[in-house]
From Swiss-Prot:
Chemical reaction(s) catalysed: N-(5-phospho-beta-D-ribosyl)anthranilate = 1-(2-carboxyphenylamino)-1-deoxy-D-ribulose 5-phosphate
Listed GO MF terms: phosphoribosylanthranilate isomerase activity
Protein name, per record: N-(5'-phosphoribosyl)anthranilate isomerase
Disulfide bridge positions per record: none
UniProt entry tagged with the keyword DNA-binding: no
Family affiliation: Belongs to the TrpF family.
EC number: 5.3.1.24
Keyword Glycosyltransferase belongs to the record: no
Pathway assigned in UniProt: Amino-acid biosynthesis; L-tryptophan biosynthesis; L-tryptophan from chorismate: step 3/5
Stored InterPro entries: Aldolase_TIM, PRAI_dom, RibuloseP-bd_barrel, TrpF_fam
N-terminal signal peptide: none
Keywords tagged on the record: Amino-acid biosynthesis, Aromatic amino acid biosynthesis, Isomerase, Tryptophan biosynthesis
Organism: Acinetobacter calcoaceticus
Length: 213
């Protein structure tokens, strides 16, 4: 199975073009003001002009209300919602109902977490996928850290691997976890929110190599 890839935290049109040219399946836009990768609605609208059909646009939100997300959707054509905060399964269901979008939940893999149970809770709530990310006591994603990949389960729901991925380790990551998709942000950056074209290309080459083996 071909492993999908999302380049997240894009803020510049040239980075969209680099990701698309390299073969990314999805582009992630961050709507969380504390993040250095946050984009305004105006920025997002401009970036969308460079994203072709068949490349999904994922909007990342952290503990946002349905009304806050809808205010973005009124202006920005997002395909999928990535809920990356402390949203409960019930809150995710309500957001999906009101926003009428597919969604997936990001789960930070804490040392004591029962990963299978947590994934199944969100699967039962209607998640179209679940993203497993490294845990950090203060940050919501983009930590640059990875978790113990041996904890990556095999379940009947698409699972996305995130956290500390780079061009150097993505082949091993895919072969170890057999993830449905991989999600990278800091691993392909020259600076926070500024992607590096060559790193994106090398990362996507690694994704293709890892999928083929």
């Amino acid at each position: 199975m071909r492993t999908r890839a999302k380049i997240c935290g894009i803020t510049r049109s040239q980075d969209v073009q680099a990701a698309v040219s390299a073969g990314a399946d999805a582009i992630g836009l961050v709507f969380f003001p504390p993040s250095p990768r946050h984009v305004s609605i105006a920025q997002a609208q401009a970036l969308l002009q460079h994203i072709p059909a068949y490349v999904q646009v994922v909007g990342l939100f952290v503990n946002a209300t349905a009304d806050q997300i809808k205010s973005v959707l009124d202006c920005v054509a997002l395909d999928v919602l990535q809920l990356h905060g402390d949203e409960t399964p019930e809150q995710c269901q309500e957001i999906a109902l009101q926003c009428k979008r597919r969604w997936y939940k990001a789960i930070q893999v804490k040392p004591e977490l029962d990963v299978v149970d947590e994934v199944q809770r969100y699967q039962a709530a209607g998640a179209s996928a679940v993203l497993l990310d490294a845990w950090h006591p203060e940050l919501k994603g983009g930590t640059g850290h990875q978790f113990d990949w041996s904890k990556f389960p095999k379940l009947d729901i698409p699972l996305i691997l995130a956290g500390g991925l780079t061009p150097e380790n993505v082949v091993d990551a895919i072969q170890t976890t057999h993830a449905f998709a991989v999600d990278v942000s800091g691993g392909v950056e020259a600076a926070k929110g500024i992607k590096d074209k060559q790193l994106i290309e090398r990362f996507m080459q690694g994704v293709q190599c890892g999928s083929a083996k």
